[in-house]
């Protein structure tokens, strides 16, 4: 969906798709009709919309168009295998996987200049662009670290540690103020991190881990002992909470949607309604949404608390 407008991007999927999987339809809900149709040789895995552009992710390429009727093709970029259809579209930049696993291509929309960010050594699993377009967060298939980059110069600003064991990252999302990052994974945990920003003072893992707010004091004095493994000094989330994965399992009755590789409905999709409220949505027969809020305790430390939930395809509360 394009912001809060009446335009919806639709791609066929499921057991009985209305549209073929290689066809993108832009639907005008106000006029109740199709206004743009695009067809490709392979399945559409991801779509991003802005007021001026349509971005389509295929398995090995990214296609950009002017948002007009008829649409005008602007560019095609080659990528490594991108089965999740990863792409982030801002007002000034477009980010998507590079030609090598773990790399990010960052395109400046006004000039078309392309920069390469060597973000990870393993394939990308998730990406998120801040609302102001100045910060890019990435995670790989390893699922232990989230790396933060400034889009203005592609510099790495921080590494945030989700955990020490392997995990499948479901979703990354940056808050409306550009100051917080939420992360979900198959560990059924929602993590919330403070996020560095280029407009603020220079940021480093050492500064974050020694901050006075206690956010990163997971290991206490161990984090300050030289030569210990970096896991003791890395930046951890300041708050976390459990979310529900649901009870359904992959099976012959479920047709996984395009852009997923888990053989099960998408889970843990994050949305911020404001800087203190996070929604986590899961689909499938056990589809539900959960609402989490960030609150300060008596000592001023923030906690992530589940305030409510509902099964939107069944009964719940």
Curated annotation (Swiss-Prot):
SMART domains: WD40. Its main location: membrane. It is found in: Vacuole membrane; Cytoplasmic vesicle membrane. It is a peripheral membrane protein. GO terms for biological process: autophagy of mitochondrion; glycophagy; nucleophagy; pexophagy; protein localization to phagophore assembly site; protein transport. Keywords: Cytoplasmic vesicle, Membrane, Protein transport, Repeat, Transport, Vacuole, WD repeat. PANTHER family: WD-REPEAT PROTEIN INTERACTING WITH PHOSPHOINOSIDES WIPI -RELATED (PTHR11227). Belongs to the WD repeat PROPPIN family. This is SVP1-like protein 2. It comes from Emericella nidulans (strain FGSC A4 / ATCC 38163 / CBS 112.46 / NRRL 194 / M139) (Aspergillus nidulans).
């Amino acid at each position: 969906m394009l912001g809060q407008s009446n335009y919806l991007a639709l791609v066929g999927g499921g057991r009985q798709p209305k549209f073929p999987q290689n066809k993108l339809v832009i639907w005008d809900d106000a006029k109740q009709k199709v206004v743009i149709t695009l067809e490709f040789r392979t399945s559409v895995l991801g779509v991003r919309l802005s007021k001026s552009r349509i971005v389509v992710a295929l398995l090995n390429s990214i296609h950009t168009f002017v948002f007009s009727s008829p649409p005008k093709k602007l560019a095609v970029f080659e990528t490594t295998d991108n089965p999740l259809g990863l792409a982030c579209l801002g007002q000034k930049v477009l980010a998507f996987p590079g030609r090598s696993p773990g790399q990010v291509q960052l395109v400046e929309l006004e000039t078309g200049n392309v920069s390469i960010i060597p973000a990870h050594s393993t394939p990308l699993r998730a990406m998120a662009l801040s609302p102001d377009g100045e910060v890019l967060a990435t995670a790989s298939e390893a699922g232990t670290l989230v790396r933060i980059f400034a889009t203005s110069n592609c510099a790495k600003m921080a590494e945030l540690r989700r955990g020490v064991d392997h995990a499948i990252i479901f979703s990354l999302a940056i808050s409306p103020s550009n100051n917080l990052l939420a992360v979900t994974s198959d560990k059924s945990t929602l993590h919330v991190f403070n996020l560095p920003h280029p407009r603020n003072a220079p940021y480093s893992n050492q500064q974050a881990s020694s901050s006075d707010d206690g956010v990163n004091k997971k290991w206490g004095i161990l984090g300050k002992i030289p030569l210990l493994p970096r896991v003791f000094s890395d930046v951890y989330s300041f708050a976390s909470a459990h979310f529900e994965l649901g009870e359904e399992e992959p099976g012959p009755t479920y047709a996984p949607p395009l852009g997923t590789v888990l053989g099960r409905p998408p889970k843990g999709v994050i949305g911020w309604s404001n800087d203190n409220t996070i929604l986590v949505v899961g689909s499938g027969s056990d589809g539900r949404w959960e609402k989490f809020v960030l609150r300060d305790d008596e000592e001023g430390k923030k906690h992530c608390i589940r305030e409510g939930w509902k099964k939107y395809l069944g009964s719940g509360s």
